[in-house]
Amino acid sequence: MKISKAIPSIFKRVYPVLEPSTQMVVALSLLRFHEIDALPIGFRTGESKKLAISGYSCLSRLLEIKPKDYGRFLEMPCEVTAVELSTIDVGKELEALLRLFEKTKFGFSWVESNGSAGFASLRDLVDLYANGIVGAKLSAKDVASPVYSLPKNTKIGPALKHMFKRRIRRTFITGEEKFVTDRGIISYIFSASRLNVAAKKPHTLLDAKLGDLNLIKPIQVGDDASLKDAAGAMSDSVENCRICKAGVITPWDILMKPLEQGKLAIK
């Protein structure tokens, strides 16, 4: 099935387009408000190189900076955190989009059509289980990933380093069936209240503890639940994941693991 037929909704969204000189504090506010994986940086359809900022690129750049310079980071132009976007034509097969995710290890891409374009992400694709466009004869336990956890008094800086090292977007709280995400961390540290504190003491930007953040309780499914059931309404949740006894289940697990195993059926 073609991308255009599988996920036509991607061209109906409205994205703010950042100028390369947009300050990081403004860019991050827009990223928080729109609750999406990335924002494009001033480009036009047809250009050979597409740039964007993502939560991952912003946080990884922040960790490279000394705490005393966190204030300077907020004033930097957003282009300093830019990453090159992978692009694909809307006329390509759905599997080609998934293979692009597999290659880049990022769960989003820029999809182009004549005169229009938009982001496609794994979050868009999990609903395809419900309408039968994709399917896999696997259960939740077959695709679950290990649960990594940290104490709730862990500061945000070390927590982010832990998440980046393991290439995970969620970390659970030790002793609790709750977790935080990279998106949740962005929403917290770049909120108005935290930025007011950081304006006076920039070095404290990442001093908050995980327990200070909004902790999320994942929906539980049985180990033997079908992937269709595990995927149910996952795209409606910004912090989408499920948990079973075998581990945590994310959109990547739901789609990419069956693909990698050669067990994902696509219409």
Regions found by a protein language model. Name each.
Residues 45-51:
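Short, solvent-exposed loop/turn segments that connect beta-strands within catalytic domains
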Residues 1-14, 55-86, 98, 102, ...:
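Tandem CBS (Bateman) regulatory domains
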Residues 168-170, 182-183:
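Conserved active-site beta-strand-loop modules that form the wall/rim of enzyme catalytic pockets
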Residues 22, 43-45, 57, 61:
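Short glycine-rich, polar/acidic loop-and-turn segments at beta strand-coil junctions
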